[in-house]
């Protein structure tokens, strides 16, 4: 199953009970590979919304562990899509400068991001 943003995340970035049920039903239905939706790797700068799940801190791992154990018990293999919103992030929402790989906005009239330096990327 390809990663699809459900927008079920808690405002804290935790996976909700709704997430747990959503993915569990797919594993029980016979899905062999489940790729979890885009998880933020740098909060708040890399966030693409208030309902995006996070994986930028160890405090989120117990919930992932619980989900993965459940999915494995139901026969599914699990992967996750990691995400940094880059130019799609909004400085109005994050309160931080928008950065990306270039200064090209993601849409016409969109916020112009600051290109990251090689040192920032490494």
Regions found by a protein language model. Give the residues of each.
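Flavin-dependent oxidoreductase catalytic cores
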Residues: 2-122
């Amino acid at each position: 199953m390809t990663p699809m943003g459900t927008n079920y995340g808690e405002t804290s970035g935790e996976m909700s009970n709704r997430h747990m049920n959503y993915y569990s039903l797919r594993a029980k239905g016979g899905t062999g590979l489940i790729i979890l939706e885009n998880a933020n790797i740098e909060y708040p700068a890399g966030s693409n919304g208030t309902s995006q799940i996070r994986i930028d801190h160890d405090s989120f791992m117990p919930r992932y562990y619980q989900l993965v154990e459940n999915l494995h018990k139901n026969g599914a293999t699990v992967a996750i899509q990691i995400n940094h919103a880059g130019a799609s992030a909004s400085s109005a929402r994050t309160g931080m400068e928008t950065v990306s790989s270039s200064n090209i906005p993601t849409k016409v009239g969109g916020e112009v991001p600051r290109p990251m330096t090689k040192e920032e990327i490494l």
